[in-house]
Amino acid sequence: MLVLTPEWGIVSDAHGGNWHRQVSLLSAEKIEAFRKKIWVDYGAFGENLVIEGFDFRSLPVTSRFAIGDVVLEMTQIGKECHNDCVIKQQTGECIMPREGVFARVLKGGEIHVGDEVALLPPLEDPPLRAAVITLSDKGSRGEREDKSGPLIVEMLTAAGYVVEETMLLPDEAKALKAQLIRLADGRQVNLILTTGGTGFSPRDITPEATYAVADRNAPGHRRGPCGTHSLSHPPPSPGVLSRAASVLRGKTLIVNLPGSPKAVQGEPRVHPCPSLRARRPHRRRSGRRVRPQVNCCPAPQHPSCRAAAR
């Protein structure tokens, strides 16, 4: 039996907490396919729940599952392995980065081996989900307070968005690209707004990193997500002299904003954009959970430091 709470996830699990990756799940069918290469026990990939009948990667983030009284909401697809992942060292691959998913607990309760798992119908009008990334060398070193990021969060919240993540990064293209890919592909947020790094100095790399991860260019959105306002209205916005990019990666719109609070305030207002909503078939389905696992180790997961649920 496992006990789950919204505040922590799985009680006694070392990776629990008030965050979006409280519970990890893997499809039983994916594990069986991997076993044709090498035998692994349930829990070897660090998963908490092994479930039959679901191809999790084909489901959109925010999918909700009912297991008895427990309700889980899928929050992320995949996660890169740690450098000391034993399975990856032995076989050259691990299925968790591409097949594993994570969820938060919306409603707590008990889970038992063999409980039925139901995919719940999607919400009729879910809020749009966003992330905010501030690019600043000095800010990342603690030498300057980030004022633009919180301002953007305030604007997004006022417009009805749910801000899933905020982060402060140095002006490094590699780090920015990695986070843009993770937020767009793994977390599937509707909108990513970056602030900073759009000027003309050698360290201003935000547009280049943004274009590098893009599937399509979306220049019209530089006049505001959904094109609701224009930057050309007087008085001139402090952010006009900018190399900012606006692109699409999958179903995620990525828009670069200037770095200063004044320039951010001079940008177009953010409005909810219905076209950002994913339209995916979402049918009610049920599966059967095979075996729960509780990760009891405080460090990266190893097959040797996992414990089966009692």
Task: State the predicted function of each range.
Residues 79-95, 296-308:
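Cysteine-cluster motifs in flexible loop/terminal segments that predominantly coordinate metals
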Residues 38-48, 85-100:
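Short, basic/aromatic beta-hairpin or loop at an interaction surface
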Residues 71-73, 78-79, 109, 118-126:
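Short, charged beta-turn/beta-strand-edge "cap" motif at the junction between a beta-strand
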Residues 53-84, 216-246:
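Mid-chain, well-packed structural core segment of small domains
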Residues 1-71, 76, 110:
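Electropositive, beta-rich accessory/interaction domains or terminal extensions
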Residues 113-116, 120-310:
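Non-catalytic beta/alpha edge segments that cap or flank active sites
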Residues 96-119:
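Compact mixed alphabeta submodule
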Residues 37-39, 62-63, 91, 106-107, ...:
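A generic local secondary-structure boundary/capping motif
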